[in-house]
C-alpha cells in the first residue's frame, strides 16, 4: 500500500537533507513512533518525481513524498499570513467542522485582552495574534494550539479606535515563517520577534517614511515572501502636489530597506488612502507584487519595485467619487487576477501577462463587471469560480473565465468585514455580529450551516491543524476537535 504526502521545503535547491533537518519547523508531520529520517532510510518514504512551487514564499516548494505501507501519517497546513500560504484564502485541510456554537465543536476558547481585526497566523503548534489592551497598549501574542498563552509583548502605546467599533490599531495581520514573526501596528510600529518571543528588531515606519496620512489608520498587512517583507503605504493629505504613497521591500531578518518606490497616482481626496493589502502573482513564468489603492492596481518587480503595469478606471473619471477608497484586496491565481474596487464599483478580471498602462487595453482583461464589487471582503477564486462576498452578506458567484454571473444569494443580512475562505468543498463567510455561514462550494447555492458565536468579528478565519481559528473581539476560538 502506498499514498502520497506533500510537504513544504524552504530550499529552492536540493530537497534532501535540509528538508529533513527542518521538517518539524515547516509542517506538522506525525509518523507513528519512527523518526522521519528513519522512514527514508527504511525505504518507507521516498521523494516523488514532481515538485512544484506554490505559496507566497518565493523559495517554498511543495514536494511530493510517497509513503509506503504501515505508518499513520497526518499533515497539517500552516496559515502563515493573512489569507493563508498563497494569499488566496484557500486551505487544503479536510474534515473540518460544518456546524458549531459557543459550546459545540469548540476545542477551546481563549479570552483576549481586547479587540482586533487582524487575522491570526498559524505555524505548527503556534498561533500569533495582535491585540489592544484596555490600557491602550498594542501587543503581540503567541498562543499554543492547545489554547495556552505562551508569550505577550508590548509593541507600542496608544491605541486609536476608528469609526466607532470598525477598527483600531491592531488591524494589520501578523506574518510568520515558522522561525520569526513580524507584527505591524496601525501607528506604524513594525517589529520582528523569534517565535519564542525574543525581539530581533523594531522601528516605526513613520520615522523612516514620514507621517501616515490615512483617515482610518493603517490596516494593510505586511507580505512575507522568501527573505523579504513587502509593505504598501498608500496614503496622502489630499494635495496633488505632494504625493506620499510608496511601496517598500525590507530584509526580513534585519529590517533594512532593500528598495523603495514612490507610487504615483492622480487620486483625489480620500481616494489617496488605501486599506487593502499587497498580494503576489506567481505562476512559474512571471511573478510580481500587486499593490492596490489610490484608484489603481499596480504590478511591481519583486527585485527593485519598478512598475510593470497598472490598471485604472476602477474609480471611473467620468463619474469620479472622491470618497472611493479601496479596502478589499485583489486575489491572484494562475491565469487570473480579480481586482475589486469599492462602494458598488466595478470588478475586473485581469490577465497576468499585462504590460504598461492597460486601462484602455481591452485584450488585457478576461472580463469586466461594472458593479457590485465587495467593499471590504476580498474576492475568492476556486476551481473556475469567483466568489464575491458583498458587505451586506450577498454572495455572488461568477465564472472565472467569462465573468458571467451564476448566482447572487443572501446569506446573513449583516455587515461583512472578514474575507471568505475555502476548505474541504465549503466557503466560510463571517458576519460582523459573529455568525459564520458555511456555503457549499460550486454552482448551486446551498447553505450548509449558520453558526453563531455571539461576539463581534472583523478578522478573517485561519485554517490549520484540522481546525478553524476565529478571532472575535473578545477571544480566540479553535473550532474543531
Predicted regions and their residues:
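Noncatalytic, solvent-exposed loop/strand surfaces
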Residues: 61-481
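Hydrophobic alpha-helical context, especially transmembrane and signal-peptide helices
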Residues: 4-8, 39, 60, 75, ...
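N-terminal secretory signal peptides that target proteins for export/translocation
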Residues: 1-31, 51, 56-57
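Bacterial N-terminal signal peptides
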Residues: 32-47, 64-70
